[in-house]
Amino acid sequence: MLRSLVSLVAVALFAALPAPPAHAQAAKKLVRIHTAGPNDVNVDNTMLAVQFADYINAHSDTVEAKVFPASQLGQSREVIEAMRLGSGASATTGGPAEYASFVKRLGVLGLPFLWKSYDHASAVLDGPVGRELEQDMEKAGFKVLAWSVSWGYRNVVTAKKEVKQASDLKGLKIRTIPTKVFVAAINAMGANATPMNFGEIYTSLQSGVLDGYEHTAATTLSFKFNEVACCIALTRHLMDPTFLVFSLAEWKKFTPKEQEVMTTAARAGADTVRSMAPAREAEALAAVKKAGMKVNEIDTGPLQKAAVAAQDELAKDFGAESLLAKIRAQ
């Protein structure tokens, strides 16, 4: 009898307790966003990641997004490997080159002198070429949510010699990233591509081992290369698109409504980054001029013609001849 009375009292007390708020009944699903970029929204990939996360956090009651900049979750290669298996990071922002070992045809997006403008790149990536590559990515275990562009074309920067015309590049030892595309791009311009680790650029310019390197104006200032280099020739030979990629295994764990919010978030973030690209590039070029560097516009027509053969050869290697034809035609 006493035991029954105690049970009845306990049930009554429990029933009288206030119900927990809806948000406390189920923890939010966490989206972990990897980017190799620093914790600085003045960097394109970091800006894309932050815009994506902020939109999700403002528009979803069931999903929380958090950015992990500066490779906090690991180096990009290992992060991407884990994403294929549905572990570690949920998504990344970065360049297609990071995924090219999984989807070879992505290499076509990094060909020299491929992009006529930021608008050209955006139109191509929003069209049939982008859709084909998205299908390739899904087969490899990844979901592309949005494409964007880098903040700045890569140009040739020299230590002592001022490059005023295409022929001035002939024979110059120019540091490149040690990949086939970058080496082919520099050699096609008549310079001598010199593959080298990024950390060796400064001292190699000082010592004369290098005549120059190729990169964006923003990078030149960030790493103080203006202290050992004099001039920038606006070759605009490469511009890497960027994209926001989700683990396909992870993506399937979200409801259609949650997926819709994240897709909208990615596209809104990508649009913001795209819209800022021309101004950010102009700001960086103005800053290097202010720092005392000479910036020369040059006729890139001869360089573009010389790069056609390299484009053809590389596209064949990537199995992307049809994609290259579509990009050229657009």
Enumerate the predicted regions with their spans.
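Bacterial N-terminal signal peptides
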Residues: S7-A16
